[in-house]
A protein has these predicted regions:
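Sec-dependent signal peptide recognition
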Residues: 1-9
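Residues embedded in well-ordered secondary-structure elements
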Residues: 5, 50-52, 106
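Residues that line or immediately flank small-molecule/substrate-binding pockets and catalytic motifs
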Residues: 8, 57, 121
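Extracytoplasmic/secreted proteins and extracellular or luminal domains
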Residues: 9, 43-46, 110
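C-terminal motif of bacterial Sec signal peptides marking the signal peptidase cleavage site
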Residues: 12-15
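N-terminal secretory signal peptides
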Residues: 17-77, 81-82, 140-152
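Helix-rich interaction surfaces within compact, conserved domain-sized segments
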Residues: 77-155
């Protein structure tokens, strides 16, 4: 009887371990999917609003700007340590309604700089993730935008 109980418990543990969420995509694999569907780098992008954002890989975010305009934004700096756990972020730009290279993104008090911005074919990303049985990322809508005075202050 004891052997049967142990066997059943082992089977139950194995079943629980194998069920539930689909396997989590490795961050490098995840980033590769997004990079395959991203266009060439742009120096800056004009937007009306940043509707949503989510972290991708180790040091990138996707911004949904307006309706169905998505951009893969690669960051450099310490903020990437908090991207996965952040619920909000702040974009600090030198021009109103424009995000560009060298602008800042602040996550939990840590500042990163925008290294590159690339237009993203999100429908293709979504299709590839769904084909592989992967879940879509959780989107966050908490984005603060600050425009700093870019004037030189000179004569």
């Amino acid at each position: 009887m004891r052997a049967v109980v142990i066997l059943l418990m082992s089977a139950l543990v194995a079943a629980c371990a194998g069920s539930g969420e689909p396997r989590e995509r490795d961050r490098f694999e995840e980033m590769a999917v997004y990079e395959r569907h991203a266009g060439g780098a742009e120096s800056w992008v004009r937007y009306t609003s940043i509707r949503n954002w989510w972290a991708v890989g180790f040091n990138s975010v996707v911004f949904e700007m307006g309706r169905s305009r998505f951009y893969l934004v690669e960051l450099i700096g310490a903020c990437d340590l908090d991207l996965d756990s952040a619920m909000t972020l702040k974009v600090v730009s030198g021009r109103r309604n424009v995000i560009g290279e060298f602008d800042d993104v602040i996550v939990n008090g840590r500042t990163c700089q925008v290294q590159s911005i690339r237009r993203l074919d999100y429908e293709a990303v979504k299709a590839e993730l769904e084909d592989e049985g992967e879940s879509l990322p959780d989107k966050h809508d908490n984005v603060d935008v600050e425009t700093q005075d870019a004037s030189s202050g000179g004569t």
